[in-house]
A protein has these predicted regions:
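Flavin-dependent oxidoreductase catalytic cores
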Residues: 1-208
Length: 208
């Protein structure tokens, strides 16, 4: 039984991943009709939220029929992410999700999204600060590592759990792979089978 805080997702939950320019309200409504157990908004820039940018604020709109639903944020600065998480909480989502997986150059090369996989201590610190800043359950979406030499996801997942996240979604590729090659589900399984892990672990990549 998958459970995030007090949210019961059943035995084999299907999640709608947060996708920029895809996971908007009409698409979410369609996915909900077809059985999505948990959905997320498009990712939202932490800097955009704290600057009250219209495009970012508009993505906070969620509807009762969508529940349970999470709002996802991304950013490179701990203070901005902490403040953005608090803003998200005011929109009353069920979950606040942190994007540590976006591989796109304009995001990752600024240290946000998958870019933070090059600085695991910062990733852990940022997560801890966000968890402390909000009352809603915090989840994370990330990748196996930055490249083939840094696939530290088993250790990283455990460290993120230790600072308070309540679920983790893992894309079975590195940032260097982008969306090429095949997703490595064996490493996702290694996280799931780690006896020290007790939070839900969701797999992402090549799901069909």
């Amino acid at each position: 039984m998958a459970r995030i805080a007090n949210i019961d997702l059943g035995e084999f939950p299907l999640l709608l991943a947060p996708m920029e320019d895809v996971s908007d309200p009409p698409f979410r409504a369609l996915c909900k009709q077809h059985g999505a157990d948990l959905m997320y908004t498009e990712f939202i820039s932490s800097e955009g939220l704290i600057r009250d940018a219209a495009k970012s604020v508009a993505k906070l709109d969620i509807f009762e029929y969508e529940r349970p639903i999470g709002i996802q944020i991304f950013g490179a600065e701990i203070d901005s992410m902490r403040e953005a998480a608090a803003i998200c909480e005011e929109a009353n989502p069920d979950i606040i999700d942190i994007n540590y997986g976006c591989p796109v150059k304009k995001v990752a090369c600024k240290g946000a999204g998958a870019g933070i996989l090059q600085d695991i201590p910062k990733m852990v610190s940022m997560t801890a600060e966000i968890v402390k800043a909000v009352q809603k359950p915090v989840t994370v979406k990330t990748r196996l590592g930055w490249d083939d030499n840094t696939k530290y996801i088993v250790d990283v997942a455990e460290r993120l759990q230790d600072v308070g996240i309540q679920a983790i979604s893992i894309h079975g590729r590195t940032r260097k792979q982008m969306y090429k090659g095949e997703a490595d589900w064996s490493l996702i399984a290694a996280v799931k089978n780690n006896p020290r892990m007790h939070i839900p672990v969701f797999g992402n990549g090549d799901v069909d």
